Regions:
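Short beta-strand elements of extracellular/lumenal beta-sandwich folds
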Residues: 40-80
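Short acidic, flexible loop segments centered on an aromatic residue
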Residues: 76-109, 148-150
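Intrinsically disordered, low-complexity Pro/Gly/Ser/Thr-rich segments with frequent PxxP/GP/PP motifs
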Residues: 100-140
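Acidic, contiguous N-terminal accessory segments
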Residues: 146-306, 310-336, 617-626, 822-825
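Feature activates predominantly on carbohydrate-active enzymes
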Residues: 286-288, 292-504, 509-515, 520-536
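Active-site neighborhood of glycoside hydrolase catalytic domains
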Residues: 493-497, 502-637
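Flexible, acidic glycine-rich loops studded with aromatic residues
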Residues: 615-830
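Short, compositionally stereotyped local motifs that mark structural "simplifiers"
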Residues: 784-892
């Protein structure tokens, strides 16, 4: 794209002339230009407004929780006299009240709101500041709560993003948080992760010595015996792997480079064979392998091709990171702990590139993760091309300012007025086939998710655009074929993300079934063409509800109790309650009530999948909650992602799903949702509705097959101990999955920051059961801070081992693979004028800079520097190419 630039002098002259000619009759373009140059500054005033005199309940706040924020708009050179304009902005919190009478804030849809002038608007003079005091629902404790890319409109002028918010860095338009505002509630007992608190936490790490690092493999094998002596690999390795495909061998050769090895006919001999009958019955599992390394050669025996591939990955994992690569002589017998070892990636909320998807899949294979759950659609975007339904990508994959939504979806999640960022985008048919083949070569199953019946707004809007186009062309029958709404449905609903009834496709329409059948058929054809038959279909199914009928609200016409928002519940409906098509289903006895519609629809989808030969239907568990058990569905297997928050009862309710015959994939948000922040600090990005923080150590300490145990090793959202017990039988876990939802993830670098290195402890828990993980016992109670069923010393020792492997070996390998993982922020304190600093991982470099300068020096723990005043610290990766965020330390 060609761009023309003006000199600073020309810009100044232009601005002066422009300011001179602006009059009361400003053109729409002039108004938009003036608004686009406004400076926006958001200041969090009080996150506990309900405890400080604001009647949050009367304002209708869920659970009577609200916060106060000031928005300050500072005008530029040009006065704004017109009242024909709007400022659109993204707010993940419902706006309850705005106290400047010159302005009105209106909720548009989802997180999109607009500011417009009222009849009391007096204009905004050049350089004038105006303040909009806002009361919003819940709280806002992280910078990432505030979305970028406000934009301005006026008349028929093209909308423009406000320059001050057109950034990926919210600190550019959000004022620094005061210490009092990092807590959600007064009873929040989480520890704010300052440099000093982080230093104290990091002191617990006891890194392994170089000798102790011999033969360490991630994920940890079932059984490993080290022998005396190491093998020199400086000449490379000579691979002879029988039974692997050409594509699999290509992957292995690429992974050689990540551990600084090369294929060489004169190198160390590595032989591989597939011999299923060599394995005992208990070890006859896909992915099982045996590895023997002697001074003469290495021999890998796989139970199957997957096992041979994994055996080779274990060999590469064992290679040292020393300048002269070596490997310990050893014997390994290994098999996977769980059948399902997964990673979920949401590309619906924000689009992520094919390249970052492939990098993720490649690293999954290195750590023996085998299920890629691909969340391809959501309210905010449809991300896969479906031949025959071009509107899904022409409209549903794009976000821009079109109030009629005939050409795109309305902006959401900081995407702004235009479609030139990750709010827009999709995978072509060929892209998806490429991803399938890429995953196949790495023994990873791609599980597509087309979310329904809720979270379907991108599909609903797209099919309405299709309906309007075909109807205008006179094709009434074609227009109705895939329509997803019942025009008779006047239900008043609010989805979890603040959309209206168009967030849900109507499960009672034949046209909705036509749509599902069409999409399934087209995706199946892509799988067939890729040589990867579709085995698992993810139905989605989550959150088909009206949040304003939830327990945090009460009806203004009933008895009023404290702690709940007061609203008019009588005007609220359950989804589809006023749809004549759904009313008829209930009247005819096909469905018992509106609550059962989602599960009823899931049953119908499962029947279609079974007829197409798909053996497994997967869903978020709440989408199937009204079924009796797994036998209600037609597919051979029915699998659920179990995502109840553990401390709110998930330690017990998981058993119900397993006992009903579902394959349970543990996906608890308070442990393995990787869109949650790494630590309790406003600068860490992420949502925090389930937990204030989940760092690598918390993921590592998670016991997925004995959920009550986690009460002894973690705290709840408010940093408090909790108690967990279940009296029910527990048939056992089917799998473990880590999730990255993308509401606050807008770039590929942010994807990798949030996923890595948390994926590594996820892989460890999915593959290997640690000694400190207790077997489940019905009736055993775990009380945080009191009971001692878990060996905390064994857990600490295991973490020391794992953290050393990650810091010394795995992070440099991620660097070589081009993965933009999160570099840990140093812990630091100044004691008696001396800077003390440390890290959560060994192997990285700490740097410091004195005062306000950016003169960075390497920190030495052996010779800590004497300092005066404030000091900035940061960590740098081993390659010296990237750094952590900067933390400031001052003398206490």
């Amino acid at each position: 794209m060609k761009k023309n630039y003006l000199s600073p002098l020309a810009l100044l002259i232009s601005a002066t002339l422009f300011s001179t000619i602006v009059s009361a009759e400003q053109s729409s373009t002039q108004v938009v230009d003036a608004l686009a140059n406004m400076d926006v500054k958001i200041n969090v005033i009080d996150n506990q407004a309900g405890e400080h005199g604001i009647d949050c309940a009367a304002l209708g706040a869920d659970w009577a929780a609200c916060n106060r924020v000031d928005i300050t708009l500072t005008n530029g050179f040009d006065a704004i006299e017109s009242d024909d304009w709007a400022l659109y902005f993204h707010s993940i919190r419902q706006i309850l009240k705005q106290d400047n009478p010159q302005f009105k804030i209106t909720h548009v849809t989802g997180d999109l709101h607009k500011i417009t002038p009222t009849s009391q608007f007096k204009g905004i003079k050049a350089h004038e500041k105006v303040v909009l005091p806002i009361t919003g629902e819940y709280w806002q404790v992280n910078y990432s709560d505030f979305m970028p890319r406000w934009y301005a409109t006026s008349g028929d002028a093209l909308p423009r993003n406000l320059k001050s918010t057109d950034t990926q860095d919210p600190t550019q338009f959000v004022a620094p948080f005061e210490l009092k505002n990092w807590k959600r509630v007064g009873a929040d007992n989480n520890v704010l992760m300052t440099a000093e608190n982080r230093y104290q936490k990091n002191t617990a790490l006891n890194a392994l010595s170089e000798q102790q690092m011999r033969g360490q493999i991630l994920p940890t094998p079932l059984d490993i015996t080290l022998q005396q002596g190491d093998v020199d690999l400086s000449k490379g390795i000579n691979l002879h792997l029988e039974g692997l495909t050409k594509e699999e061998l290509t992957v292995i050769n690429e992974h050689l480079q990540q551990v600084k090895l090369k294929q060489n006919n004169q190198g160390f001999l590595v032989e591989g064979k597939i011999i299923p009958n060599q394995f005992a019955i208990d070890n006859q599992i896909s992915g099982a392998y045996e590895l023997v390394i002697t001074p003469q050669k290495a021999l890998i025996v796989g139970y199957d091709r997957v096992g041979l591939f994994y055996g080779m990955e274990s060999l590469l994992s064992a290679v040292s990171e020393s300048e002269k690569p070596t490997i310990a002589t050893m014997t390994v017998k290994d098999k996977p702990r769980m059948e399902y070892r997964g990673v979920f990636l949401d590309v619906g909320r924000n689009f992520h590139s094919k390249q970052v998807v492939m990098r993720l899949i490649d690293q999954m294979s290195r750590y023996k993760l085998n299920k890629f759950h691909f969340h391809l659609t959501d309210d905010e975007g449809w991300r896969i091309e479906i031949p025959g339904l071009p509107e899904l990508t022409e409209v549903g994959s794009q976000r821009c300012h079109d109030l009629d939504e005939q050409t795109c979806l309305l902006p959401q999640l900081g995407s702004g007025a235009e479609n030139n960022n990750m709010g827009s985008g999709y995978f072509t048919r060929d892209d998806y086939i490429d991803i399938l083949r890429y995953a196949k070569a790495r023994h990873i199953e791609v599980i597509p998710e087309i979310d329904m019946p809720a979270h379907a707004r991108s599909a609903v809007v797209s099919m309405e655009a299709r309906y309007n186009k075909l109807k205008a062309a006179g094709d009434e029958k074609g227009a109705e074929q895939y329509r997803l709404v019942d025009p008779s449905d006047t239900s008043v609903t609010t989805s979890v993300q603040f959309y209206d009834k168009r967030s849900y496709l109507n499960p009672c329409l034949e046209s909705s079934k036509n749509f599902v059948n069409k999409v399934v058929s087209e995706v199946m054809q892509m799988h067939e063409e890729a040589g990867v038959p579709l085995k698992t279909w993810h139905f989605g199914g989550d959150e088909a509800k009206n949040i304003r009928l939830g327990a945090g609200f009460q009806d203004k016409n009933g008895a009023i109790e404290s702690g709940k928002g007061i609203i008019d519940k009588q005007i609220e409906d359950k989804p589809w309650a006023k749809s004549k098509a759904c009313q008829l289903l209930i009247k005819n006895g096909d469905v018992s009530d509106f609550d059962h519609l989602s599960s009823h629809f899931a049953k119908q989808v499962s029947e279609g999948l079974q007829q197409e030969g798909v053996t497994t239907m997967q869903a978020w568990q709440d989408g199937l909650k009204d079924a009796v058990n797994a036998k209600d569905f037609a597919t051979k297997n029915v699998r659920v992602n179990f995502w109840d928050t553990l401390y709110w009862g998930g330690f017990d309710s998981a058993n119900d799903w397993a006992n009903k015959g579902y394959q349970v994939v543990i996906s608890n948000p308070d442990y393995v949702y990787f869109d949650m922040p790494y630590e309790v600090n406003p600068s860490e990005s992420g949502y925090y509705w389930a937990t204030r923080a989940s760092d690598e150590q918390k993921v590592f300490s998670f016991a997925p097959d004995n959920l009550p145990q986690n009460a002894e090793t973690s705290v709840d959202r408010d940093g408090n101990q909790f108690t967990a017990k279940s009296d029910k039988p527990w048939p056992g876990i089917y799998g473990l999955s880590g999730q990255l939802w993308s509401e606050a993830v807008r770039t590929d670098d942010q994807v990798e920051y949030m996923l890595f290195p948390r994926i590594l402890p996820l892989a460890e828990r999915a593959w290997h059961k640690a000694e400190w993980e207790n077997d489940y016992q019905a009736g055993r109670e775990y009380v945080g801070g009191k009971t001692q069923h878990v060996s905390q010393q064994n857990l600490a020792n295991d973490w020391d081992r794992f953290a050393t492997i990650v810091g010394v070996k795995e992070l440099p390998r991620l660097d070589r693979a081009g993965v933009a993982y999160r570099i840990p922020v140093p812990g630091a304190k100044i004691e008696n004028g001396v800077l003390l600093a440390n890290l959560s991982y060994p192997g990285l470099v700490i740097e410091y800079s004195l005062g306000e300068s950016d003169h960075w020096q390497t920190y030495s723990a052996q010779h800590p520097p004497k300092v005066n005043g404030s000091v900035k610290v940061r960590a740098k990766n081993a390659l010296g190419t990237r750094t952590s965020r900067v933390e400031i330390v001052t003398q206490k």
